[in-house]
Amino acid sequence: MYYMLIGFIIVVIAVISAGYILKRKHYQRINELEETKIKLRERPVIDELSKVKKLKLTGQTEALFESWRSSWDEIETRLFPDLEEVLLEAEMNADRYRFRSATNTENDIEQMLVVIEKQMDQILGGLKELLISEEKNAKESRMTKEKFAELRREVLTRGFKLGETLPYVEAKLNSLAENLNRYDSLTDQADHLEAREIVISVQKEMAVIEAQMERIPSLLHETDTILPEEMNKLRAGYEEMVRKGYYLAQMELDKEISRMKTQIEKMKQNVINLDLDEAEEGIEELHNEIELFYDTLEHEAEARHFVKENHSPTSDKLKRQNTVSDALAEQITEVKQTYHVAEDDLAVYLKTSAKLSEAKENFEQLTALIASGEIAYSAAQDTLKEIDAALLSISSEQDNFAEELRSLRKDELEARDDAERMRRAIITLDRKMERERLPGLPEEYLSLRAHMGESIDALEKRLEEKPLNMKAVSQDWRIAEEDLTHLTEKAEEMMENVRLVEHVIQYANRYRLRNKELADELVQAENHFYNDYQYKKALEIAVTALEKVETGAFKKVEKAYESKVSVDDIE
């Protein structure tokens, strides 16, 4: 019981201590908020309002001043009294240990102080700007009027450089003078804010006018002097080239110069209207156009040099290619008496011949136009280049065709020699098989041998045809070579199998008397070997029978065969 009482007392003391600590924290925060309120109240809003009120305000300035004073009245009559009530409520909540409510109230006070401070900042900032603007206006007004007077003097002394833009510049200056007079009137009425807006506007306008006055003389010089002179030089160069025999009608220069003159008048009017950016852009475009015309004239001069340098060489190339083409036609006639020339191959020649005729016709037309001066040298240059490219293609195609014709005789002789070589190869193969002393030849091989002979006969028969069709010869030639390769491979395989069968049976004989199954299978293998000459099948039967008795025996026999070791020496 005693310990329970002690525990209870400790809890009570802890609660009271915690409450006291929290209460002190809230009082501390409330005091801080109170200090912030006092600092806000001490700000010199009333003093600043009084200073500004003495300025005898009017217009926009007066309206702004009244709005600031109304805002201050709201702070004095409503916001501060409301703030006092909420501060009192916060203290009461803290006294009664209603800490959550106290916290919420303190947060509300902070928000109210922020609102009040923001409004006071706006009032003081506006009042300060107004007081400064009076002094600033006086200083900037003096500088602006001096700058304006300087612009006036410059227009009077250098107005001749502005040309027809002078009335427009003077009209702008007169408008600025009216704005400066209005500034003085507003300043006299103490409407300093609106007066300041006018000063700033006049300064900006004067900067624009000053920049325009710098640009106008050079732009007028472009439209009145430089561009017309450039067009006159262009026309003079054009006419000089025409007198020298250049065909330049495609340029339509008279029409283009007339159009550019209209553009110059338009650009000048833009300058007069003070649309200087548009005028500058248009002037630059005209310079670029004139430059393009000069590029065209220069290209014509270069093209004339090219035509004079390449006309005769191109004529010589045409003559040489005509000679080559005529010789090729004679060669075709001669070859056709001995060889068959395919229609596709003849079509190649006919196509190149037609292209050559077209190139010759184009060259003759070009020569006539150059002589009469009815073609631009640039167009003549393009045509010469096209003719030269066509001749290069024709020459390549006709050279290839001529080479194909020359190769016909060479291919014929090679085919005849190869037919003879293949006959000798068959005889050699037959003799080799005879030396092997085979029991006989299987039907399959005899059939291949007969077919091989027929292939060579077909090739030799084809070579006797008149006219000789070398494409058909090549096809028969290829078939005969393939048949010879196949026959040779079969013969080598057959002789290989015969030797292996003999070695396997000889090795297997060591088991023959002891193994009836092996003996029977060897008899079967020998039957295929000696009777129907199926050497591959005989080898398969003998190997299978031997492997049943001795696994891996065939590898030993095969290795001994390759090493030319006697079967009797195999262990």
From Swiss-Prot:
Location (main, coarse): membrane
Membrane topology label: Single-pass membrane protein
A Pfam family the protein falls into: EzrA
Keywords of this entry: Cell cycle, Cell division, Cell membrane, Coiled coil, Membrane, Septation, Transmembrane, Transmembrane helix
Keyword Methyltransferase: no
Membrane spanning stretches: 4-22
Superkingdom to which the source organism belongs: Bacteria
Biological function: Negative regulator of FtsZ ring formation; modulates the frequency and position of FtsZ ring formation. Inhibits FtsZ ring formation at polar sites. Interacts either with FtsZ or with one of its binding partners to promote depolymerization.
Protein name as it appears in the record: Septation ring formation regulator EzrA
Species whose genome carries this gene: Listeria innocua serovar 6a (strain ATCC BAA-680 / CLIP 11262)
Phylogenetic classification of the source organism: Bacteria, Bacillati, Bacillota, Bacilli, Bacillales
Encoding gene (name): ezrA
